[in-house]
Amino acid sequence: MNKLLNNSRIISGKIYMVELDQQPAKLLRVLTETPTHIIFVEEGDHGSDVFERNKQDIQGIYELKDWYEANGM
């Protein structure tokens, strides 16, 4: 599985599987990226939540297909 965060291949507006520190992996849309942070949108049935994370707090960002294939789903 290719960790996109290490390769600077993140596309704004795209949905990725994201592993954040001390949280289970979840689907998040990347809104934009700064040199130190990534701003995400978490979309749900009752609306959206926009938040930022320091890149050092992100364990990995993966293409959905790669994530599901690697985890046997």
Language-model features: locations:
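Mixed-charge, Lys/Arg-rich low-complexity intrinsically disordered regions
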Residues: 1-9
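Residue-level signal for functionally critical sites in structured catalytic/ligand-binding pockets
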Residues: 4, 35-37, 41, 67, ...
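Basic/aromatic-rich interaction segments and small domains that mediate binding to polyanionic partners
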Residues: 15, 23-51
